[in-house]
């Protein structure tokens, strides 16, 4: 079914793909046709052409031509030798010229690259001129600010010096006052110690007197307390009856008893125990009054002793409190003086540090400006060299000063420019240190 559709002349051309054999049939058909035409031409040439006459004439012409060609070959050989020599020379010259051409091309490429780099550097440094002008202006402003800061710093240093002198005078005055207070407190302390010592001695003496008085009081009390009037009177009567006088009076004869003197003497002797009792009672009352008086005096002495102890303790406490207050006042004054002095020194150090920072910044900006000027001069000279090497009528740009109306400087661009300059100046310092270590 597929073969019938392939061989049909009415078959559609886009239905199936044609194979290699389909194209080979037409190729062999055309090859056979060409072979047939060649054979037919040869047969006609052999039939209708004069082969011998044509061959002789062709042979003579060929000999003549061979002779001429031989002569030409000999001449050409000689010319070939000459040309080969010239060719060798030309090849050497060509190689030399090619080397010079390559060298010239490399030099030209290098000069072109250098020229392009110089053009880029020229554009860059033309843009840098604006930053350099801004740096110069900022340097002038920094110098003016440094002058103002120096004036302010000198004024502040003068004020601080005056303040330090005033504080030193106040400290000297306070020290004098403190020394006077200290001397007065020491004198009060010595006086208080003397009073305290005197009070201690008086207390010891009073204690000794009190002990003696108490011992005497105890003795008197031990004697007076057990005294009983009736018992004492009975003891006196019994002692009277046991006495020699009573027995003598009792043993006297009767006629002596009738005498009036005997009666008065007997009454006197009998009333003697009562009189003694009365006297002893009066003596006891006097002793009791003395004991009470001594007791009151002892109580008064104890009270005075307590008052003196309290006064001594109060004086000691006042002395300690005054010493503590004076010491605290002296410490406070010293701390205040030290704080004021430290503040003055810190302000002075801060002002000096600020002035040193401004001076270092000014020096750094001066160095940056000098480096930029040197680098710009080097780049301009390199650019002039490149321009002369290219032999182009290029006019070097004017970098002597900024344009009359420069555009405003972007602070971020200016900081970036400063950062690049610092990095470019920092790199040569790092590389020499890194080379010996490797």
UniProtKB/Swiss-Prot annotation:
Q: Cross-referenced PANTHER family, in alphabetical order?
A: PLASMALEMMA VESICLE-ASSOCIATED PROTEIN
What are the glycosylated positions?
Answer: 82, 88, 112, 150
Tissue specificity of this protein: Expressed in lung, kidney, spleen, heart, muscle, eye, pancreas, thyroid, thymus, submaxillary gland, prostate, epididymis, uterus and liver.
The record's function comment reads: Endothelial cell-specific membrane protein involved in the formation of the diaphragms that bridge endothelial fenestrae. It is also required for the formation of stomata of caveolae and transendothelial channels. Functions in microvascular permeability, endothelial fenestrae contributing to the passage of water and solutes and regulating transcellular versus paracellular flow in different organs. Plays a specific role in embryonic development.
Task: Provide the gene name from the record.
Answer: Plvap
Assembly: Homodimer.
Q: Please give the start and end residues of each transmembrane region.
A: 27-47
**What is the protein's major site of localization?**
membrane
Q: Where is this region: Disordered?
A: 391-413
Q: Does the keyword RNA-binding apply?
A: no
**Which residues fall in a compositionally biased region of kind Pro residues?**
394-410
InterPro entries in the record? PV-1
Keyword annotations of the record:
Cell membrane, Coiled coil, Cytoplasm, Glycoprotein, Membrane, Signal-anchor, Transmembrane, Transmembrane helix
Q: Please tell me the species this chain comes from.
A: Mus musculus
User: What is the reported phenotype of gene knockout?
Assistant: Mutant animals result in lethality during prenatal development. Examination of the homozygous deficient embryos reveal subcutaneous edema, hemorrhages and defects in the vascular wall of subcutaneous capillaries. Hearts of deficient embryos show ventricular septal defects (VSDs) and thinner ventricular walls, as well as blood abnormalities.
Per the record, the coiled-coil ranges are 140-160, 189-224, 281-383
Entry GO terms, CC: caveola; perinuclear region of cytoplasm
Starting at the broadest rank, the lineage of the source organism is: Eukaryota, Metazoa, Chordata, Craniata, Vertebrata
Where is this protein localized, as stated in its record? Cell membrane; Membrane, Caveola; Cytoplasm, Perinuclear region
Residue ranges that the UniProt entry lists as topological domain Cytoplasmic: 1-26
- How is the protein disposed in the membrane? Single-pass type II membrane protein
Query: Keyword Coiled coil, does the record have it?
Result: yes
Q: Name one GO biological process term.
A: positive regulation of cellular extravasation
Name of the featured protein:
Plasmalemma vesicle-associated protein
Which Pfam families does UniProt cross-reference here? PV-1
Which regions of this chain are Extracellular-facing, per the record's topological domains? 48-438
